[in-house]
Amino acid sequence: MKQKCVLIITDGIGYNKNSKFNAFEAAKKPSYEKLFKEVPNSLLKTSGLAVGLPEGQMGNSEVGHMCIGSGRIIYQNLVRINKAIENKELEKNENLKKLLAKCKRVHIIGLYSDGGVHSMDTHFKAMLEICAKNGNEVFAHAITDGRDVSPKSGLNFIKDLKEFCENLGVHFATLCGRFYAMDRDKRWDRVKEYYECLLGKAYKVPNLLEYLQKSYDENVTDEFIKAAQNENYKGMREEDGIIFINFRNDRMKQLVEVLNSKDFKEFEREKIFENLLTMSVYDDKFKLPVLFEKEKIENTLAQVISKAGLSQLHTAETEKYAHVTFFFNGGKEELLENETRVLIPSPKVKTYDEKPQMSAFEVCDAVKKGIEKGEDFIVVNFANGDMVGHTGDFNATIKAVEAVDTCLGEILECAKKHDYAFIITSDHGNCEAMQDEKGNLLTNHTTFDVFVFVQARGVSKIKDNMGLSNIAASVLKILDLEIPKEMNEALF
């Protein structure tokens, strides 16, 4: 069976038997049609307990790539935090107790929705309650979502938060869309707007809930809400404590850097803050206390390949680069021996419906070069189905799928020419359900299964009831390497 192998992750493309508002079904996709006819294929589970999330919880890119790259189900921070709240362990956390003892005033910052991708509203409320009951003066800073949940669901979430704050005696201080507060692509002008809001220098309003409704009236949805503050909020003081409740790291790193880093040079800052506490490890370079330390994941797919002396290439465009490197490698930043990484910049557009092909063709070229060079293993992510799917633009998402299909055709032709095996799958769904029955836009991930295709010598059938955690062992089997005991079985 021994063959070199390409693993292609088509982000956000899932299987939905309903063809209505299904951008995958609506797209012209000759490469996929060929795959369905000629290559062994099946469906994989990408949500809930199959990827270490609560039952019924949609999967996401971080969880999906970690599951694929580690070859096992890792119980995610969302599940760990839920358990810590249920059994009252969170309030006993030593780092939390230290911060609350040191700082009279405490600010809670995070994405406020039940999307479960970056955060959970229940975690936000639990933290507000712990801090308020401890006697601290508490300020809530809600970031509106509209991406992992529907675009105007924020009104109900923020109404809920406002009432919760009033009942607890907590200040509801600021409101801002994730487009600004949670940028991850070094668009510092966006983060600066939110930083200034936290300092009390933003647009002042008497009622943040009414401000949100007014934004809707002006066709601005949750993701894009401009930073605003309650008129009574006077801003953060340098001695205040700041707690970040997002458990996913990639969209909080820039904000933490702005608030805390002494070496930050992107724009002038009036204040920097020392008393920060993050829900999880956002970046090893931040020497900050955390509530939930990361679990050590050993014997990942990338590690096994590296230890065997084989070469590997990891490539994606900016939006998904962290997923094929940090998350795929089990939450480790360091480059492994014989590992090459190729980052393709994502296009500089406001939203990706403006350029649905994104940088897919450049990513495709990087893969073909890797095959021609003879890399033993290549992992690539095509971001289009997910990132354009998040915009809610159906026609643009059809074009996104068609761009991915074109790239698949080119890669598979190149793979065949150089005798490479390939596995194609997705980390989760998105573009296959763009509206609900009532015609409301769906911009979030789905809980649908995803396709998997395996073309390798000796493989004629894929086992039933498999998941993302079965892919790593499959790659090792193709490469003829020993499968570590920590990994789940192969797909075939």
Curated annotation (Swiss-Prot):
InterPro entries in the record, alphabetically?
A: Alkaline_phosphatase_core_sf, BPG-indep_PGM_N, Metalloenzyme, PGAM_B_sf, Pgm_bpd_ind
Pathway field = Carbohydrate degradation; glycolysis; pyruvate from D-glyceraldehyde 3-phosphate: step 3/5
GO molecular-function terms, A-Z: manganese ion binding; phosphoglycerate mutase activity
Question: What's noted on cofactor binding?
Answer: Binds 2 manganese ions per subunit.
Entries under HAMAP family matching the protein: GpmI (MF_01038)
> PANTHER family, from UniProt?
2,3-BISPHOSPHOGLYCERATE-INDEPENDENT PHOSPHOGLYCERATE MUTASE
Q: What is this protein called?
A: 2,3-bisphosphoglycerate-independent phosphoglycerate mutase
Q: What does UniProt list as this organism's lineage?
A: Bacteria, Pseudomonadati, Campylobacterota, Epsilonproteobacteria, Campylobacterales
* Gene, per the UniProt record: gpmI
